[in-house]
């Protein structure tokens, strides 16, 4: 994880360093940049070959070559190249400027990542979250009757679990115990409201199924919590902070 972060940071520094240097390079002069490419050909008073009637060669009204009304090359009314009425590039009259439009708000990547990792918070359950749907595990109960009963009724059992963040528990057993109790309670209440009742066999099987899913949820949440902690430690180290400050200097400067 640390090696990958270092390589990503090095690549980021190299990219922005090149962009920062490009921003500070002066723009070279060229065709139609306003300055003369042949300064020795002009006289102090103006053109070496002054036009008759005030215009240049092929200039009937004082514009440049091919300029009928004093605009630049291909400019019929004095605007920039491709500007028919004097506006900016691609702007017809300059009255529809896009510069004053407010920028759209950006969603914080940190908030998006946190929401995706933590799951959806369930209202009215005191901070419990609902995990993503899982495939119900294949469990053997030790006899043919219960195994067959489970296969025939597994669709009636939960495929999602309720849980709290792993940092609120001291160990896996406490997390799993709380996860099993709240999940079975919520599923039983919801299903009973719909007119369906559970037998003792159903409750026994639900406990086994939900326990396996809660263990899977704990492992998933623990891994995500560890990765978030490692990222915070990496980006809070002094060398990384110094490099980020240098990148900001290049971008702003």
Curated annotation (Swiss-Prot):
Disulfide bonds: 179-214
Chain spans, region Interaction with GRB2, ERI3 and SYN1: 23-230
GO cellular component, one term: Golgi apparatus
Leader peptide range in chain numbering: 1-22
Pfam families: Prion, Prion_bPrPp, Prion_octapep
InterPro entries the record matches: Prion, Prion/Doppel_b-ribbon_dom_sf, Prion/Doppel_prot_b-ribbon_dom, Prion_copper_b_octapeptide, Prion_N
Lipid-acceptor residues (GPI-anchor amidated serine): 230
Glycan-linked positions: 181, 197
PROSITE patterns, alphabetized: PRION_1, PRION_2
Chief subcellular location: membrane
Membrane-topology annotation of the record: Lipid-anchor; GPI-anchor
Renumbered residue ranges of the record's region Disordered: 26-108
Residues where Cu(2+) 1 binds: 61-63
Classification via PANTHER family: DOPPEL PRION (PTHR15506), MAJOR PRION PROTEIN (PTHR15506:SF2)
This protein's name: Major prion protein
Native source species: Trachypithecus francoisi
């Amino acid at each position: 994880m640390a090696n990958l972060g270092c390589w990503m940071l090095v690549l980021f520094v190299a990219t922005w360093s090149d962009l920062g240097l490009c921003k500070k390079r002066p723009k070279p002069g060229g065709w139609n940049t306003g300055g003369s490419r042949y300064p020795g050909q002009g006289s102090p008073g103006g053109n070496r070959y002054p036009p008759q009637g005030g215009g240049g060669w092929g200039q009937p009204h004082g514009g440049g070559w091919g300029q009928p009304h004093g605009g630049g090359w291909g400019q019929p009314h004095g605007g920039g190249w491709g500007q028919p009425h004097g506006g900016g590039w691609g702007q017809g009259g300059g009255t529809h400027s896009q510069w004053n439009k407010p920028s759209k708000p950006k969603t914080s990547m940190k908030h998006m990542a946190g929401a995706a990792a933590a799951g959806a918070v369930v209202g009215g359950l005191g901070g419990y979250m609902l995990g993503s749907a899982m495939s119900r595990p294949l469990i053997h109960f030790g006899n043919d009757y219960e195994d067959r009963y489970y296969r025939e009724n597994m669709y009636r059992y939960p495929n999602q679990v309720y849980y709290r963040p792993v940092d609120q528990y001291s160990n896996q057993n406490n997390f799993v115990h709380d996860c099993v109790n709240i999940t079975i309670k919520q599923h039983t209440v919801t299903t009973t409201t719909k007119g369906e009742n559970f037998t003792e066999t159903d409750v026994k099987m639900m406990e086994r199924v939900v326990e396996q899913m809660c263990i899977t949820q704990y492992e998933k949440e623990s891994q995500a919590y560890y990765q978030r902690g490692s990222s915070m430690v990496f980006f809070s180290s002094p060398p990384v902070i110094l490099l980020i400050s240098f990148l900001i200097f290049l971008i702003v400067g």
